[in-house]
Amino acid sequence: MLDSKLLRSNLQDVADRLASRGFALDVARIEALEEQRKTVQTRTEALQAERNARSKSIGQAKQRGEDIAPLMADVERMGTELSDGKVELEKIQSELDSILLGIPNLPHESVPIGEDEDGNVEVRRWGTPTAFDFEIKDHVALGELTGGLDFETAAKMSGARFALLRGPIARMHRALAQFMINLHTAEHGYEEAYTPYLVQAPALMGTSQLPKFEEDLFKISRDGEADLYLIPTAEVSLTNIVSGEILDAKQLPLKFVAHSPCFRSEAGASGRDTRGMIRQHQFDKVEMVQVVEPSTSMEALEGLTANAERVLQLLELPYRVLALCTGDMGFSAVKTYDLEVWVPSQDKYREISSCSNCGDFQARRMQARFRNPETGKPELVHTLNGSGLAVGRTLVAVLENYQQADGSIRVPEVLKPYMAGVEVIR
């Protein structure tokens, strides 16, 4: 979340910057609450000082043999008023905190200004889409032809937006995840982690999925115990490794990577991508998270994005990189690059990775800090996250870009060591 001090001291400037994201900050309400808070706090502090003085005078009056009953009554009355003032302050602060939790991050000055995805700016492209000399099939048809993709059986078990993978296609799905993890750990310096798939609300609060995006989550209610949520991304569990920690500066940067299933209700996706594996309730993803010093986070974003790009380059899949505009960025991001891979059957690029610098937005919620070696004082870290990559969508891209005229699929060179001798899926 944003720094409350920044909000109080630069309220209109913050509102103007948020407006570029299409977010209307209720300046009048915040100003009114701040005025109430100051009034109650000033009154409470004055009352506390007066009560302290009266309490002191009770002892003095007692020594002089005076009647202390009136003073005792005053002190008791003031105690009640102080309790009432504390309750009032807590109520005001609770509303301010609620407003603060609903405010998105401030965009970096380098982020393009725009209202929606039409305002995104293409940064670069890599590779050239194949010019097929036969009628291409989409991944659903290819999967059904080879017997490796079964949506009907999955729907019978679980309903819409689920897939059953079998045989060589299931192996390729696993191979992709193994290849990505091996690349990021061996060449990009990430530490592999295996994390819980179920987390409590504070973990999701820390990474900003809660309270704003609860409808996108799958929740498990338990009698007498804290509710649990299925993770929508391993970003949640990886980033929360540093929740509540004060790190030594020498430990930074921390770079974590995990392969996990992800679970999303897709509450706002009705009617979109209903065919195939593009948008699922359950999908696998390899997630990268970095925890860095504030001065290095923008440079780290470039490196994180390059790490995700390297997966696509080694798979020889054409892609492009977009700098997301202010109106299309995620809630917690300062700046985001999206990677979009070429999907031949759709004749367009589709998102396969989103790489974001969240600045200190998540760290402030989690109280994730490092000790500044120059001042000796704890300061908030910066956190970054990115898909490296979404495994299901990468499988879609491989199936379609490596298809042959007879409906078979060539195995990319970098995946062959993981495929037990299979070079063509038929």
Swiss-Prot record:
It is found in: Cytoplasm. One of its GO terms (molecular function) is serine-tRNA ligase activity. ATP binds at residues 264-266, 351-354. Pathway: Aminoacyl-tRNA biosynthesis; selenocysteinyl-tRNA(Sec) biosynthesis; L-seryl-tRNA(Sec) from L-serine and tRNA(Sec): step 1/1. The keyword Protein biosynthesis applies. It comes from the Bacteria. Keywords: Aminoacyl-tRNA synthetase, ATP-binding, Cytoplasm, Ligase, Nucleotide-binding, Protein biosynthesis. GO terms for cellular component: cytoplasm. It catalyses: tRNA(Ser) + L-serine + ATP = L-seryl-tRNA(Ser) + AMP + diphosphate + H(+); tRNA(Sec) + L-serine + ATP = L-seryl-tRNA(Sec) + AMP + diphosphate + H(+). One of its GO terms (biological process) is selenocysteine biosynthetic process. Gene3D superfamilies: Bira Bifunctional Protein, Domain 2, Serine-tRNA synthetase, tRNA binding domain. Its EC number is 6.1.1.11. L-serine binds at residues 233-235, 287, 387. The keyword Cytoplasm applies. Residues 43-63 are annotated as: Disordered. Catalyzes the attachment of serine to tRNA(Ser). Is also able to aminoacylate tRNA(Sec) with serine, to form the misacylated tRNA L-seryl-tRNA(Sec), which will be further converted into selenocysteinyl-tRNA(Sec). Homodimer. The tRNA molecule binds across the dimer. Consists of two distinct domains, a catalytic core and a N-terminal extension that is involved in tRNA binding. Belongs to the class-II aminoacyl-tRNA synthetase family. Type-1 seryl-tRNA synthetase subfamily. PANTHER family: SERINE--TRNA LIGASE, SERYL-TRNA SYNTHETASE. NCBIfam families: serS. This is Serine--tRNA ligase.
